[in-house]
């Protein structure tokens, strides 16, 4: 019985070591680089202001010249 327990314990330790040895830390680096790219895209993206479209249907972006005029007034 003790021999069986010892064998199971050794097998468990070997499997645990194999899991640790084959862990992929690269995935964490890829995830971090993807997060960095998202942050850069969020910084670059500029929000657009919308106004009601002609005839009251839908929304359309406010033209930049009109927006700049309103902001500078």
Swiss-Prot record:
Subcellular location(s) per record: Secreted
GO cellular component, one term: extracellular region
Record carries keyword Calcium: no
Chief location: secreted
Residues of the signal peptide: 1-23
Entry annotated with the keyword Signal: yes
Subunit structure: Interacts with human F2 (thrombin).
Protein name: Salivary thrombin inhibitor XC-42
